[in-house]
């Protein structure tokens, strides 16, 4: 740096002049650094936004729905597929079309229940999966809308389910011994392989990184679904249809925990 001395000024005055000048230069440099850092942060923010939007666009692409998504469904913590009817028609389909000899069938003791089945594929089913399916059967039954917090659920073998003439669609006669459980009505919801999955909490903890627990409450299902949708989209950086969330939730009002 070249310095010019003003001979009309004292040494102290010359020094003060260059000191003030250097301070102004430092402020300019500091300002430039601050502007650069701010610009870099803005660029990073834009990049993150771009990546997020790209993920959203990717998730918007129409995915092929699995056959079981027309029913209540979940994968147990032991990775067994469990499906249940949503109404008389789908109960009828679950039993007549998808129930196989080695499956385990569930229903509540009270009327107004889905027929749930564990698709065993001939494998031994752990007690945990049986408990989870019983809880799902209870939670997706009319007991939820009636405000009942626990209800009896039985499980049976497929050969105990009899189709008899004169019974309404989705209704079957049950013969023989029933194995009973009395689960609490409670579920959770998360994303499993790009699909909204609503199931007992133990299943969701096993398969989903982020989730919400739900119980019977006083929030309208449609309003709760909007909150759940927002949570899932933010946590999983994905796009999910509101109708998909609505379809997997139990009927009736909800409390989100």
Model-inferred region functions:
Residues 1-257:
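Extended, highly charged segments
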